[in-house]
């Protein structure tokens, strides 16, 4: 089976600090990979290079042409003026009766406590943790090949 994403001899440096040095990695469908390390050790950088947010300084990153992927990072925030429903439900392009009867959507919204926040609540009124849950829910309700969490 072909990998969803491949990193081949990838390197990345910020200033004088080399965070990635000749990293090679393949991610297959169904893989669950955890990356651990010290603060400033390159974990987020690896994920950003892996997902195309940042280009590598050297090496190659490739992925399947039809890869459906979501990235939930600590660095990106949601626009304050959007409601929770606009962030999570609208991208699905489903009518209310369709998503409300969708078990996956209901399970994600209930499991992450999103329903308790209120779907019409503006994102700008949410705490940082609530925003992260909304961002995570927006990724998990989609039909994706790969979800990357930072």
Q: Locations of the language-model features?
A:
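Conserved structural motif at the start of ABC-family nucleotide-binding domains
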Residues: 5, 19-22
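Conserved hydrophobic segment flanking the Walker A/P-loop of ABC-type ATPase nucleotide-binding domains
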Residues: 27-28
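The feature captures the beta-strand-to-loop junction immediately N-terminal to the Walker
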Residues: 36-38
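Helix-to-loop junction immediately C-terminal to a conserved catalytic motif
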Residues: 51
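ABC-family P-loop ATPase nucleotide-binding domains
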Residues: 2, 67, 73-131, 138, ...
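Conserved beta1/A-loop at the N-terminus of ABC ATPase nucleotide-binding domains
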Residues: 5-15, 61
């Amino acid at each position: 089976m072909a990998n969803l994403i491949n990193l081949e001899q990838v390197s990345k440096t910020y200033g004088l600090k080399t965070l990635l040095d000749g990293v090679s990695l393949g991610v297959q469908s169904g893989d669950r990979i955890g990356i651990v390390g010290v603060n400033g050790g390159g974990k987020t950088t690896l994920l950003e290079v892996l997902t195309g947010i940042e280009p590598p300084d050297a090496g190659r990153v490739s992925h399947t042409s039809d890869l459906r992927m979501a990235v939930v990072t600590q660095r990106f925030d949601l626009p304050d003026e959007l409601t929770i429903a606009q962030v999570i439900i609208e991208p699905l392009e489903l009518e209310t009766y369709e998503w409300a009867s969708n078990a996956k959507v209901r399970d994600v919204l209930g499991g992450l406590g999103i329903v308790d926040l209120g779907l019409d609540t503006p994102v700008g009124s949410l705490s940082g943790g609530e925003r992260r849950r909304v961002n995570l829910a927006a990724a998990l309700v989609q039909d994706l090949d790969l979800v990357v969490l930072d």
